[in-house]
Amino acid sequence: MNTIWGAELHYAPDYWPLWLIYAGVVVLLMLVGLVIHALLRRMLAPKTAGGEEHRDYLYSLAIRRWHWGNALLFVLLLLSGLFGHFSLGPVALMVQVHTWCGFALLAFWVGFVLINLTTGNGRHYRVNFSGLVTRCIRQTRFYLFGIMKGEAHPFVATEQNKFNPLQQLAYLAIMYALVPLLIITGLLCLYPQVAGLGPVMLVLHMALAIIGLLFICAHLYLCTLGDTPGQIFRSMVDGYHRHRTAPRGDKSAV
């Protein structure tokens, strides 16, 4: 049993609370849904000749360093939290890794906020509410149907707006709601005497982590929706967003 941290909420392999079972089912269903979407896209999307490739420098070195550091911290936090919470492997080490990565995540989040306050990157997180519902419907339709038919993306990333409307809302929710809540609940788990709500905070912290896991799964899959599976990932290596214009007479290519 985990006697170091959250022992009263230790979950052995033969005991999972009902809410955690439901959460596991949700994660599994999401993964199945993403696999089905990928298979349908592969089978149904028409093969079109690519047009001329355009490159726009949209991701500064600071943003890319923050992104990769943040991604690494999320992975380490999820793994150390999983191993520590379920007493897999060296629990004491996992708790230490989780704690230090949590403080590092706090530093990275502060850095993210400062970047948005002091550079032009912040404009990409300012929502234009005029026609927002219509734009979200267009983007949802593209993900569900349009991409299967090889339709052009309804919102191309530009220097003025890097994100489509669904991306913008999702990133806002993650970076300005989920991450702060994860940090706050994590600190209250680390210092339970502050609020006296250790067990409650631990459950909430784990639930928020599962939401974060769902986001990561969706984010990684959506990053494969470029002209090639690795195209969008390359943008976080060299900073250039790439897209191809439709060849003349072909309105279906991206």
UniProtKB/Swiss-Prot annotation:
Q: Name one GO biological process term.
A: respiratory electron transport chain
Could you identify this protein by its name? Thiosulfate reductase cytochrome B subunit PhsC
Its record classes its membrane topology as:
Multi-pass membrane protein
Chain sites annotated for binding heme b 1? 67, 219
Listed GO CC annotations: plasma membrane
Where is the protein localized? Cell inner membrane
UniProt binding sites for heme b 2? 98, 205
Record's InterPro entries?
Answer: Cyt_b561_bac/Ni-Hgenase (IPR011577), Di-haem_cyt_TM (IPR016174), Hydrogenase_cytochrome (IPR051542)
Gene Ontology MF, one: electron transfer activity
Binding of a menaquinone, residues: 219
For this protein, the parts annotated as crossing the membrane are 16-36, 71-91, 97-117, 169-189, 196-216
Q: Which gene encodes it?
A: phsC
| Assembly with partners or alone | Composed of three subunits: PhsA, PhsB and PhsC.
Give the similarity note.
Belongs to the PhsC family.
Cofactors, names only: heme
